[in-house]
Amino acid sequence: MIRVAISGAAGRMGRSLIQAACQYEGITLGAASEYPDSHLIGSDAGEVARVGALQIPLVDDLGKNKEAFDLLIDFTRPEVSMANLVLCRDQGKAMVVGTTGFTKEQRQEITRAAIEIPIVLAPNMSVGVNLCLKLLEMAASVLKDDVDIEIIEAHHRHKVDSPSGTALRMGEVVAETLGRNLDQCAIYGRQGLRSERPRESIGFSSLRAGDIVGEHTVIFAAEGERIEISHKASSRMTFALGAMRASQWVSDKPPGLYDMQDVLGLLKKVN
């Protein structure tokens, strides 16, 4: 049985992760944390997630319960994830990280930590989204430079980073397949008068509204036809169950930096 700790356990995603851990075979909840000033510190994690009492209190520092878990699942914010990274590296514990919005320097620090511990880092742990990434690779390899490419994403009004980590990963997959550098070809939003759209550019548009869980569409537009590859999530449980699958997969892996393509066995390149 794999004992997982969940950081940010009282948040929307954290509660879904607790629910998923309680129903996923081979996984059990060992510890749960919330930010230090939360009024829920000390509350039963199961009651917070509405799955019934689990006798696991929310703590403000997982270091206090380091013997209670084997692996940490983190869907929080970059600064919290980086603090948890230090804890897991020092304790030799695996991590599954779904946090987005990391800086280049923070990603480099995660890469260095992966020399010592196994880490699954993925902006989206939905099986469907990761299948879409493979479809995007296939589409880009066939369509090449003969199409205009736009990525549109929508999330709830509380999401703080934009574009989403998933949208950026989709852009990276397309750019890498086409031999482009996303940092050089990405255009984030458009306003006012501009020159004609450069063919090599990849456009991003973001919507933030209501309670949208997550929607992503990549458009390949040519003269006379348009291909759209879309994914729409209706529940956070799709991400939570993906995180459980990643946790089970990485639990016996050697140190290294992995993503959901590794977890799902989708790394074989499209010809």
Curated annotation (Swiss-Prot):
GO biological process: diaminopimelate biosynthetic process; lysine biosynthetic process via diaminopimelate
UniProt xrefs under InterPro entries: DapB_C (IPR022663), DapB_N (IPR000846), DapB_N_CS (IPR022664), DHDPR_bac (IPR023940), NAD(P)-bd_dom_sf (IPR036291)
CDD domains: DHDPR_N
Enzyme class name: oxidoreductase
Chain positions recorded as NAD(+) binding sites: 8-13, 34, 98-100, 122-125
Catalytic activity: (S)-2,3,4,5-tetrahydrodipicolinate + NAD(+) + H2O = (2S,4S)-4-hydroxy-2,3,4,5-tetrahydrodipicolinate + NADH + H(+); (S)-2,3,4,5-tetrahydrodipicolinate + NADP(+) + H2O = (2S,4S)-4-hydroxy-2,3,4,5-tetrahydrodipicolinate + NADPH + H(+)
EC number(s) stated in the UniProt entry for this protein: 1.17.1.8
PROSITE patterns associated with the record: DAPB
Name the record gives this protein: 4-hydroxy-tetrahydrodipicolinate reductase
Native organism: Nitrosococcus oceani (strain ATCC 19707 / BCRC 17464 / JCM 30415 / NCIMB 11848 / C-107)
UniProt gene name: dapB
